């Protein structure tokens, strides 16, 4: 699979590095629990996020003031992290979150 958009490629590369460093949580349940615990500093949301994930994670993040960053497709995120499609990823490290914001469409947060 190719990702022609250089911003998406950079975001995926940073997510992969963060995941290997255990600074990225994946999946609705893990991200939701970390949001409730207050340990997530931003959430990357797949472009094709399901209504269920949007309801459970995106609204919770927005309600807690956690920035939401638009990502590529769930399939592209999953392929980079060696997992099936990943709709949401929670970032635990502030420096990584900053890098992801820079990579993600000029750093503009998405609407809930």
Each language-model region and where it sits:
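Mid-chain, well-packed structural core segment of small domains
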Residues: 57-85
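N-terminal positively charged helical leader segments and presequences
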Residues: 36-58, 65-67
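Short secondary-structure boundary segments
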Residues: 47, 72, 93
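C-terminal structural segments of small proteins and small subunits
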Residues: 75-112
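Catalytic cores of RNA-modifying enzymes
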Residues: 1-5, 13, 19, 98, ...
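Amphipathic alpha-helical interface surfaces
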Residues: 11, 27, 31, 39, ...
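N-terminal first-folded block
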Residues: 4-45
């Amino acid at each position: 699979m190719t990702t022609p958009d250089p911003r998406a490629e950079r975001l995926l590369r940073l997510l992969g590095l963060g995941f290997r460093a255990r600074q990225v949580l994946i999946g609705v349940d893990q991200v939701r629990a970390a949001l409730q615990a207050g340990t997530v500093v931003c959430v990357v949301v797949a472009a094709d996020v399901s209504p269920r994930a949007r309801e459970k994670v995106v609204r919770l993040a927005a309600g807690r003031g956690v920035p939401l960053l638009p990502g590529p497709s769930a399939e592209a995120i999953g392929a980079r992290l060696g997992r099936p499609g990943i709709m949401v990823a929670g970032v635990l490290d502030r420096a990584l979150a900053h890098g992801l914001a820079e990579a993600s469409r000029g750093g503009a947060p998405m609407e809930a």
